[in-house]
A protein has these predicted regions:
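Active-site histidine-anchored catalytic micro-motif
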Residues: 169
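Short glycine/serine-rich loop segments
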Residues: 173-193, 590
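Glycine-rich, Trp-frequent "lid" loop and neighboring beta-strands that shape
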Residues: 163, 572-576, 595
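Short, well-structured beta-strand segments enriched in hydrophobic/aromatic residues
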Residues: 184-188, 598-604
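Short loop-beta-helix segment that forms the pyridoxal 5′-phosphate
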Residues: 155-161, 568-573
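Conserved "HGTGT" condensation-loop signature of ketosynthase/thiolase-family condensing enzymes
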Residues: 1-155, 175, 194, 200-222, ...
């Protein structure tokens, strides 16, 4: 790939914020020094001792936008408004870029929380209503709503690393472009100011009684809301469309603190690693940075850690570096914070200005000396800017921007992405934590009867639950007390994958190994504790510890802390595709970036009481103990729910022997493919082309259909389109017939496929339904050396992964 093809530029932007709706109003407020922090919130604040927040002005929005409707959560409605502006300003229409070549990568910390709260606070006996709002609450469903509204039919990724979400999203969006999976990516983030988030930060004592004053007094944050989106394109494509780039995205970096669930590492080491990674990725030195846009929440912990990180990266030059935070204007917009502040930075750079730190009056004595104090932007022309974001769970992200797109061409080219291998794998499911291959070959379903005594609503007759896992015995030094179920599953799976790889995490290697996780929903244990505290004591006295655990990346952050994984981190809220999304994204990060030597990738899913009740509502007669349910059946469905986790250790092939000298790779990542919900065949085609093989070279296919007619048909239609008549000669496997159909099934499917590569044999489908033209019994024509893993979902899109024996 040429230098110009790799260069990533920004061709459109859109903003919805408390200071203004649309770029013009947004910048006018910044230029005039107006804050969006005010007292007009959409909920009563009499029970609190703080009454301020940066809420959207209803008069500036389309009528009824924040009310939502039966199909769309209010957060999605706000995101659509910002994303539409970005696309319009980029000149993107169906006539300029094909819908299936448009991708979306959206970040959110609490997307869908309005709907999840409605679910939690609705009488359990209102089963139909609860099902509707639970289905609408998925984070990936918000991304789907934006994509559907704007005609985006390419890959869809949802990133949820709390307040770093939209900054992480930019990095994943760039990787999609570099691998040719899209011609343009709409990327950004959204979050709304609802009482749950306001009350949560209030319970933590984090909110200032006056408008936020980063690095100044009073100490504390102001909660905000909004959405921001960018259009990313390759420079060549933008020029071909005669679009003038607004800026260039030069470098991205991320890291994990491994310190605390909510507080940043006070030494600034974690933030510094992300900053250095972004600078290295950009090929820019600290001395070339002319402006730093800080996360700058206004809390003592964040502001001090960020300043110490700057001192570590910039040395003595940190004293002279212009620094500002936009939180005084916008409040803390959570998952939208990074992208809205990037938009403000680009708008300022275009005008030869730097945005100020609104509200700064008095230094706390330990912060950047040059905080661009005052209300009016400063005149200054800078070539490069650096942006930082930090979050609950210890997640950090950073990006380097250039005001002139010509600077993007100076990046050192990777002529061919690095080869990636898998060093270790694990699975935690109804079979336990070992013996997956044997359990799948026995062919006996692992679900058992569900005890419905005491439940106010019907529960399904059977489910495939994970048996007790001795985490403290399996992972030395890890205390499972205080961990919720999802965290225990993910931590166990990640630890077992590292052990299978023979990888010992210690010394400087801790900073070079990271975690990319997938998840379908908030952790049920912690969510129950959070809303139970609201029901028992009211919003103003809710549980602060439970609030800190209802961010989607809480389990990933806890696993990273427990296992000392301090390298790049991300959380893909991909619903049923979370596992495959995590593996595909991790493979792209290793292939295209240089800030990690290895990544643990995988996903976890749990069967909370609410999921069991919802499944019983949708499939009241599904499953009997020891009786398999039909997968890929043509005319009936009776799926059984399961749960579990699976993780994999990915590394560059060139460094695998140095990382794990006693273990050989167990698989090679030959190709990945991502596409929209109607494009599973397209995703498979991407993977085949990346692997440089034909359909005839595939020895086995592992599907992730959950037993519903729709999911089965989506996989079968795509397979017939790609393989044609030859499909009858290729065994099709699916572990749901033994382990149950969990929302994290695509990760468990990948683990099963790796076992097929280890043994050379595909697995049978228990009680295989009669499907003419398909080889469902697992018999192979010969040793399984190449396996295709697939998954598709109407909201999350489609994914394909090709693995080969090493």
């Amino acid at each position: 790939m040429s230098l110009r093809e790799r260069a990533t530029v920004i061709t459109g932007m859109g903003a919805v914020a408390s200071i203004g709706v649309g770029l013009d109003a947004f910048w006018s407020a910044i230029a005039a020094g107006r804050t969006g922090v005010r007292g007009a919130l959409r909920f009563a604040t009499e029970a609190y001792d703080v009454h301020l927040g940066a809420s959207l002005d209803p008069a500036a929005l389309p009528a009824g936008l924040l009310d939502g409707d039966a199909a769309i959560d209010p957060s999605a409605a706000v995101a659509i408004l910002a994303a539409r502006e970005a696309m319009e300003r980029a000149g993107i229409t169906g006539a300029t870029i094909a819908a299936d070549r448009l991708a979306i990568v959206m970040g959110t910390s609490a997307g869908g929380l309005c709907s999840r709260s409605a679910y939690e606070l609705t009488d359990p006996r209102e089963r139909a209503q609860r099902h509707r709002v639970l289905e609408r609450s998925g984070f990936h469903v918000q991304t789907a709503a934006v994509a559907d509204a704007l005609g985006i039919d390419g890959p869809r990724l949802t990133v949820s690393t709390a307040c770093a979400s939209s900054t992480h999203a930019l990095g994943h969006a760039r990787d999609l472009l570099r691998r040719g999976l899209a011609d343009a990516v709409i990327t950004g983030g959204v979050d709304l100011l609802i009482e749950e988030t306001f009350a949560g930060f209030h319970a933590m004592g984090a909110i200032s009684p006056a408008p936020c004053a980063p690095f100044s007094l009073p100490v504390g944050m102001s909660v905000g809301e909004g959405a921001g989106f960018l259009v990313l394109e390759r420079l060549d494509d933008a020029e071909r469309r005669s679009r003038q780039p607004l800026a260039a995205l030069l470098g991205v970096g991320s890291s994990a603190d491994g310190h605390h669930p909510t507080a940043p590492d006070p030494t600034g080491l974690g933030i510094a690693r992300a900053l250095r990674a972004a600078l290295d990725d950009a090929g820019v030195t600290p001395a070339q940075i002319g402006y730093f846009n800080a996360h700058g929440t206004g809390t003592e912990a964040n502001d001090l850690a960020e300043w110490r990180a700057l001192q570590r990266v910039f040395g003595a030059d940190a004293e002279r570096l212009p620094v500002s935070s936009l939180k005084g204007h916008l409040g803390h917009t959570l998952g939208a914070a990074g992208v809205l502040e990037i938009i403000a930075t680009i708008l300022a750079m275009q005008r030869g200005l730097l945005p100020p730190t609104l509200g700064f009056t008095t230094s706390r004595g330990h912060g950047p000396p040059d905080l661009i104090a005052g209300a009016i932007p400063r005149e200054a022309r800078v070539r490069f800017a650096l942006k930082s974001s930090s979050a609950f769970g210890g997640a950090n992200a950073a990006v380097v921007l250039a005001g002139d797109a010509r600077d993007a061409v100076a990046i050192t080219a990777i002529e061919r992405p690095a080869a990636v291998v898998i060093l270790g794998a694990s699975a935690v499911a109804a079979h336990g934590f070992e013996g997956l291959d044997a359990a799948l070959r026995r062919g006996i379903p692992l679900w058992r009867s569900v005890d419905a005594s005491g439940s106010p609503v019907p529960l399904p007759p059977v489910a495939a639950r994970v048996p007790p896992i001795p985490l403290a015995r399996l992972v030395r030094g890890v205390d499972p007390r205080g961990m919720d179920t999802l965290t225990r599953f993910l931590t166990t799976a990640a630890a077992l994958a590292l052990a299978d790889a023979g990888l010992v995490i210690r010394g400087t290697l801790r900073e070079r190994v990271g975690l990319v996780a997938g998840a379908a929903r908030l952790p049920w244990d912690s969510a129950d504790a959070f809303w139970d505290s609201i029901r028992a004591r009211g919003y103003a006295r809710l549980s602060a510890p439970a609030f800190s655990r209802i961010v989607m990346n809480a389990a990933a952050g806890a696993a990273a802390r427990s296992l000392s994984l301090l390298g790049p981190t991300s959380l893909l809220a991909g619903g049923p595709l979370g596992g495959l999304h995590a593996v595909a994204v991790a493979a792209e990060m290793l292939a295209c970036r240089d800030d990690a030597d290895a990544l643990v990738a995988g996903a976890a899913d749990e069967l909370g009481p609410g999921m069991l009740a919802d499944h019983a509502f949708m499939h009241p007669d599904a499953g009997r103990e020891d009786d398999p349910f039909p997968i890929y059946a043509a005319d009936h469905e009776a799926p059984v729910r399961g749960e579990g986790a699976a993780c994999f250790v990915l590394a560059r092939a060139a460094s695998a022997s140095m990382l794990a000298p006693t273990k050989a790779p167990i698989a090679r990542v030959a190709g990945t493919g991502l596409a929209g919900p109607r494009g599973l065949d397209v995703a498979i085609g991407f993977a085949l082309r990346a692997a440089e093989i034909s359909p005839a070279d595939v020895d086995a296919i592992y599907g992730s259909a959950d037993g519903t007619l729709a999911s089965s048909r989506a996989e079968l239609d795509a397979l017939h389109a790609v393989f044609g008549a030859s499909l009858a000669r290729i065994p099709l496997a699916n572990p749901a017939s033994i382990l149950g159909a969990s929302e994290g099934l695509s990760a468990l499917t990948t683990a099963a496929a790796i076992e097929a590569l280890r043994t050379g044999r595909a697995h049978p489908i228990a009680g295989a339904a009669s499907c003419p033209g398909l080889e469902l019994h697992g018999a192979s024509r010969g040793p399984v050396r190449t396996v295709l893993i697939i998954a598709a979902d109407p909201a999350a899109g489609s994914a394909a992964l090709l693995l080969q024996a090493p």
